[in-house]
């Protein structure tokens, strides 16, 4: 898509991917701002209204991305408009993190926070799977049919889902825990200021424990397929790789819910620490097998990565949300999630491509995963029982 909007077909595959992933990363830089804005709305006026506004803004940005003329029609304005739309989309996505606060506040005494928190992650996994399937369909369009309208189909599908989401959220009731809180106390005037003044430690911990999740999520969902098909120089069939990737993402969704439920029994901290060690240990073998001309090895690589990644993904939402009391939870969780995303997640495909480019070593991206696995493990190790808030 970026090639259509920037008017260039880059022969250098590294330059092409770096450009594409740079546009992808732009939206992540806007997410913390969106988290602060919608966090203020969610903590002061209610979770429901914040979630409605965020999905409406998301749908607006998707609409404009869908109708942007290509470079041949409006020149330099095409990539400029794309970046603006990505920024708006990033702001909206920053507000979407509050879904987690909304979900776990339906739990009684926090007994199934891990399971409920995993549902939000499951929706993201399903969304990624749907996006991959739609992209696979658009690959069947060739020539002018793709240039003129084929590339717009994924955005049309996204807009359709956005409209459905707005309708569903209008019918949802406010979370019981927030309603009880609002009956007993007056909501804070500036949740963001209170967060930075009184909750620096849990805020920093939430950012750091989420880094390995954000890093791994975007490597699995965005980078792996491009790495296998284009950057690793394998001679495998692209269509088969897309099927393997889609199946892997589907399995990841199932395992995520399982590990979320498991964490309610054995502890979120314990599950995530073991999973972080697992990701550290498998990173180098995974990138090595994914660069081989063997479908069996590629499948093994996906399995090796997906199991520990799902174990991080399942409990992470609840583990982060429980670090904040209800009066700043929407703001605290949203900002932590999106700062972590901007630091470790959104730029992951770009950094991994750059690492291969400067080192000419196919397993170089493993160092990026291993770095964040260590950081998140250390952050998890210092969390104590007194840091946890359960409604």
Regions found by a protein language model. Give the residues of each.
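Cytoplasmic membrane-interface "Motif A"-like loop-to-helix N-cap segments
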Residues: 44-55, 265-277
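Multi-pass alpha-helical transporter architecture, strongest
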Residues: 165-172, 370-391
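Extracytoplasmic gate region of multi-pass secondary transporters
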Residues: 200-252, 345-348
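Helix-to-loop junctions at the C-terminal end of transmembrane segments
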Residues: 35-47, 256-268
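Glycine-rich segments within core transmembrane alpha-helices of 12-TM secondary carriers
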Residues: 93, 114-139, 161, 336-348
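Hydrophobic core of transmembrane alpha-helices in multi-pass small-molecule transporters
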Residues: 75-94, 296-311
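C-terminal ends and interior cores of transmembrane alpha-helices
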Residues: 56-74, 277-292
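C-terminal transmembrane helical hairpin of 12-TM major facilitator-type secondary transporters
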Residues: 269-315
């Amino acid at each position: 898509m970026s090639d259509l909007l920037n008017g260039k077909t880059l022969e250098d595959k590294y330059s092409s991917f770096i450009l594409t992933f740079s546009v992808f990363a732009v939206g992540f830089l806007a997410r913390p701002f969106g988290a602060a804005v919608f966090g203020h709305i969610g903590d002061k006026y209610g979770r429901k209204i914040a979630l409605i506004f965020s999905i409406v803004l998301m749908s607006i940005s998707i609409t404009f991305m869908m109708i942007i003329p290509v470079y041949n029609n409006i020149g330099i304005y095409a990539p400029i408009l794309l970046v603006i739309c990505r920024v708006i989309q990033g702001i909206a996505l920053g507000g979407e993190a509050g879904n987690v606060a909304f979900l776990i506040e339906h739990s009684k005494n926090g007994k199934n926070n891990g399971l409920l928190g995993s549902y939000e992650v499951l929706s993201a996994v399903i969304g990624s799977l749907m996006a991959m399937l739609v992209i696979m369909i658009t690959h069947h369009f060739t020539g002018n049919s793709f240039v003129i309208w084929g590339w717009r189909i994924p955005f049309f599908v996204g807009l359709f889902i956005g409209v459905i989401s707005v309708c569903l959220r209008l019918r949802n009731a406010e979370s019981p825990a927030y309603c009880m809180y609002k009956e007993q106390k007056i909501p804070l005037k500036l949740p963001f200021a209170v967060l930075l003044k009184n909750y620096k430690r849990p805020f920093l911990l939430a950012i750091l424990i989420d880094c390995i999740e954000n890093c791994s999520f975007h490597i699995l969902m965005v980078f792996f397929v491009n790495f296998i098909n284009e950057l690793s120089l394998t001679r495998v069939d692209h269509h088969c790789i897309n099927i393997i990737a889609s199946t892997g993402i589907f399995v990841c969704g199932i395992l995520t819910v399982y590990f979320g439920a498991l964490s309610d029994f054995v502890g979120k901290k314990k599950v995530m620490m073991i999973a972080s060690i697992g990701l550290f240990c498998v990173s180098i073998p995974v990138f090595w097998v994914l660069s081989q001309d063997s479908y069996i090895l590629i499948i093994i690589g996906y399995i090796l990565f997906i199991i520990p990644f799902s174990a991080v993904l399942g409990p992470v939402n609840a583990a982060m949300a429980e670090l904040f009391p209800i009066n700043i939870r929407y703001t605290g969780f949203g900002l932590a999630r999106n700062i972590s995303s901007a630091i470790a997640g959104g730029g992951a495909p770009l950094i991994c491509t750059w690492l291969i480019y400067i080192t000419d070593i196919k397993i170089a991206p493993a160092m990026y995963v291993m770095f964040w696995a260590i950081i998140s493990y250390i952050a998890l190790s210092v969390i104590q029982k007194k840091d946890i808030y359960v409604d």
